[in-house]
Design a protein with these regions (language model features):
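A short Gly-Trp-Pro
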Residues: 1-130
Length: 130
């Protein structure tokens, strides 16, 4: 990140995951993205709100990036207003959460094998938990 946008999260993230979908691969330039889920209303922009660039793909959650450097910052959960999936690589320090599963593994990049980390793997999006 260029540092133009600063944010804070007032409550601990409630979980994190690896996403291997082709959309995340193309947006990040990597084999997977790693995001943590916020609690409703816990994300606050501290600096650079004017630099936020938002767009909504047809088949996914609205995305937010920096208009200056292009860094992918977070996606908004369409089904739960105020809940965001924040890219863990955008934190200045330890985000305090570790990924607990892999999703969309049927689309995993063939050029980077899935790690043998013992985490659950889901062929598509992880089913909702009860």
């Amino acid at each position: 990140m260029c540092g133009g946008i600063r944010y804070e999260i007032s409550e601990p993230l409630v979980g994190a995951s690896y996403c291997h979908c082709t959309r995340c691969q193309r947006r990040s330039g990597n084999a997977a993205s790693v995001s943590g889920r916020t609690t409703p209303g816990s994300l606050r922009i501290v600096q650079g709100e004017e630099l936020l660039r938002s767009w909504s793909p047809e088949d996914g959650n609205p995305k937010v990036s920096c208009s200056r450097c292009g860094s992918q910052l977070w996606a908004e959960d369409r089904t739960q207003p105020g809940v965001y999936f924040v890219r863990l690589g955008t934190f200045d320090s330890d985000p305090g959460v570790r990924p607990s599963y892999h999703q969309f593994v049927d689309y995993a990049a063939v050029w980077e094998p899935l790690p043998d980390d013992g985490l659950p793997r889901y062929p598509e999006r992880r089913p909702p938990t009860t």
